[in-house]
């Protein structure tokens, strides 16, 4: 945050939450930072994603992409630049944040409920237990719109050719 907010004084993390059932690719933390700027006390909530200690669950897709946290940040940044789906504001990617000794990035916090990865949100949790059919319909339709938006990105024009490990212009899936 000191890079993102160089004018901030007395910057500190005042709240920290580690959700237990979200994020297979990287670990998720939710934190609130406070600081002073020109004599005014400010605070903001963020979501952090950090590289798992064990290196993550996905195989390396190609040399130079060993860090899934880097891959996620770079793709999210491109998706945000394309403006095809709502996406939180991203902060910088940190290759090896000294205080946690891992790769890390943060983004703005968006209020809402987080569907669980374990147990699957389609089996247990708020979506099954307390959502109305209309709320489930909205979630599914919003998800489909987001997927369609992402699939509308012209990957070469968006600068994603670095994902093509085949080098042929026809990426392996």
Language-model features: where?
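Juxta-kinase regulatory segment immediately upstream of eukaryotic protein kinase catalytic domains
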Residues: 1-18
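ATP-binding pocket architecture of kinase catalytic cores
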Residues: 17-173
């Amino acid at each position: 945050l000191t890079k993102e907010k160089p004018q901030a004084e007395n910057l500190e993390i005042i709240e920290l939450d580690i959700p237990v059932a979200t994020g297979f690719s990287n670990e998720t933390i939710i934190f609130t930072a406070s600081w002073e700027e020109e004599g005014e006390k400010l605070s903001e909530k963020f979501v952090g994603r950090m590289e798992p200690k064990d290196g993550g669950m996905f195989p390396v897709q190609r040399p130079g992409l060993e860090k899934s946290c880097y891959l996620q940040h770079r793709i999210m940044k491109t998706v945000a630049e394309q403006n095809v789906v709502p996406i939180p504001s991203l902060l910088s990617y940190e290759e090896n944040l000294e205080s946690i000794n891992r790769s890390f990035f943060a983004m703005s916090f968006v209020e809402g409920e987080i569907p669980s990865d374990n147990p699957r949100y389609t089996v247990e949790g708020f979506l099954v237990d307390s959502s109305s059919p209309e709320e489930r319909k909205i979630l599914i339709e919003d998800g489909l719109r987001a997927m369609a938006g992402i699939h509308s990105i012209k990957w070469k024009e968006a600068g994603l050719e670095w994902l093509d490990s085949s080098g042929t212009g026809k990426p392996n899936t």
